[in-house]
Amino acid sequence: MQNISSRIIFIRLLASSLVVMLLFVLSLLYGSAGWSWELENWSSAIFWELRLPRSLMAILAGTGLALAGFWMQLLFKNPLASPSVLGVTNGASLGVAFVTMAAQSIWGYNFPELTLLAAFAGSMAVLLILAVVRLRLNNLTSLLIFGVMLGHLAGALETIFQRAAARNDLPNLIYWSMGSFSKVTMIQVLWLGLSLAIVIFIVVRNHRSIDIFSLGEQIAVSMSISPSKVSNVLIFCSGLLTAVITAFCGPIAFIGLAAPHLAKLWWPFRTQLKLIPAVAITGMVIALFCDVLARFLDLPINAITSLIGAPWVMWWLYQNKTQRHG
């Protein structure tokens, strides 16, 4: 039985790797000008400065969002938790809206670097608030509710700043809010890769504590594991990845929500350490597939992820309800 299980895991790993490679190549070949099969296009500036960074960012962002969602669901014991659940994404959007309004008023022009910095600063500001509040709130459910309310507050302020922004800046705000991998650079890809490596290293170092924490806080305490330390690690790692990805790509919906569930259906792993690569590969596949499809249909990636993610959530809820009454 163990040999059969190992063979199945190997076949699924091979199949998943081939799917990622296929989607990556398709992402490199297809652009706004259509398909590019000629060899000279592979050495062009379009390939190195646009398509390659975009494809690599889709892989890394898909990985980061999937892992962030996985850790949020683990932390709150809530299968519908996602990277945006604590308001980090709303904080980034608020930062971008504020800087867009302020930059136009002060300089008459909004610098792209300011948008990037504002998104990251807004996300980290929300994380800092949550870290301070976490010292007073020992109940994770209360922290979850606080994060959701903080997100709604940031969303309301964002709407006010959008209303106050110059009319010609609104298209840029709307475009950023749709999410995209198209305007990233190789430097940003490297920064996200570094952030991802640091976060995975931290989680792997604490994987035993996280495994025990996943069994319940009481069990963790009985085995001398601090639930608050584990929750802080998960919040920091999820928040950092969400902040960096949102700063570079804008808010990307549903990948962090759906990928962990799909990974658990496809991979028969139970430990958190083994689920990390499974969730990461699933996030890569979803992000690459949605990005290629978004280019082919000329739609924002959030439209594609929502069209795929929303039916998935509805199906999951229906299946869960059916199994309970079955």
Predicted regions and their residues:
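Alpha-helical transmembrane segments in inner-membrane proteins
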Residues: M1-G326
